[in-house]
């Protein structure tokens, strides 16, 4: 009977202890990040967990798609967008903590071709992109109505007088990485992506860089989300502006803002 009593007491102690142990385990920080951030954020997440013990889980897609998911209640702690518009959209809907929002990175907009391509294109020359596409080629871009890279591309094409000759020859994709893949696989002779995307894929080469004044400045804002109840969220957002994190982003082809 004494042995039974001992095990009963031990079981009670264990049951009381389990919730404490579970809460002591660090919950991962969930980040919704623009597709163009994949390599850099994968590396940053690994570095942060190694330094702090806090795991980071990142989901990638077009900023537009991620913002809509957050608006609909998808569980996330941090939003890392490829443009200001979608971050502003969430902030206007009260879903972002303004005090924990930072304009962290910049990028360039480039015209890419498969690495084996011999094409040379001056995007300032009238009709140059349409001519380079040939008779049946299509220009790979992100969706021009919603995907940040697609919107930047459309603005640059209009500014440089190329839009009318290529607007009916666009292969619009759900994200900038999907557009990059079309070029990488040789399914499109040309595409418009970020400079960091081109650096991430050895199967493409940069044909031209669009002038900075042909489109709005490319800015990547990051922010903690209002509905996050993860105590590690603020620390992670702050760490993204640290020297170790900035070194990762710079190495991957991004320019630094803050």
From Swiss-Prot:
Annotated GO CC locations: outer membrane-bounded periplasmic space
Pfam families cross-referenced by the UniProt entry: SBP_bac_11 (PF13531)
Record's keyword terms, sorted: Metal-binding, Molybdenum, Signal, Transport
GO biological process: molybdate ion transport
InterPro entries named among the record's database cross-references: ModA, ModA/WtpA
Domain of life of the organism encoding this protein: Bacteria
Keyword Metal-binding in annotation: yes
Entry binding sites for molybdate: 36, 63, 149, 176, 194
Signal peptide coordinates: 1-22
Annotated family: Belongs to the bacterial solute-binding protein ModA family.
SUBUNIT field: The complex is composed of two ATP-binding proteins (ModC), two transmembrane proteins (ModB) and a solute-binding protein (ModA).
Record's function text: Part of the ABC transporter complex ModABC involved in the transport of molybdenum into the cell. Binds molybdate and tungstate with high affinity in vitro.
PANTHER family given in the database record: MOLYBDATE-BINDING PERIPLASMIC PROTEIN, MOLYBDATE-BINDING PROTEIN MODA
Name of the protein described by the UniProt record: Molybdate-binding protein ModA
Protein's organism: Xanthomonas axonopodis pv. citri (strain 306)
Classification of source organism: Bacteria, Pseudomonadati, Pseudomonadota, Gammaproteobacteria, Lysobacterales
């Amino acid at each position: 009977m004494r042995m039974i009593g001992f095990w009963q007491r031990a079981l009670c102690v264990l049951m009381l202890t389990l919730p404490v142990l579970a809460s002591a385990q660090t919950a991962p920080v969930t980040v919704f990040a623009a597709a163009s951030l994949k390599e850099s954020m994968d590396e940053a997440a690994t570095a942060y967990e190694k330094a702090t013990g806090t795991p980071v889980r990142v989901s990638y897609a077009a900023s537009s798609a991620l913002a809509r998911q957050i608006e609909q209640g998808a569980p996330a702690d941090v939003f890392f967008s490829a443009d200001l518009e979608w971050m502003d959209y969430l902030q206007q809907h009260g879903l972002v903590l303004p005090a924990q929002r930072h304009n962290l990175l910049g990028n360039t907009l480039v015209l890419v071709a498969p690495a084996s391509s011999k094409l040379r294109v001056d995007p300032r020359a009238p009709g140059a992109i349409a001519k380079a596409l040939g008779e049946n080629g299509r220009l790979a871009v992100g969706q021009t109505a919603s995907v940040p890279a697609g919107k930047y591309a459309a603005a640059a094409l209009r500014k440089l007088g190329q839009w009318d000759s290529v607007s009916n020859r666009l292969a619009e994709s759900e994200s900038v990485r999907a557009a990059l893949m079309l070029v990488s696989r040789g399914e499109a002779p040309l595409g418009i992506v970020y400079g960091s995307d081109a650096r991430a894929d050895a199967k493409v080469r940069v044909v031209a860089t669009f002038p900075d004044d042909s489109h709005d400045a490319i800015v990547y804002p990051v922010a903690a989300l209002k509905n996050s109840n993860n105590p590690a969220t603020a620390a992670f957002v702050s760490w993204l502006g640290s020297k170790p994190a900035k070194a990762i982003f710079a190495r991957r082809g991004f320019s630094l803002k803050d």
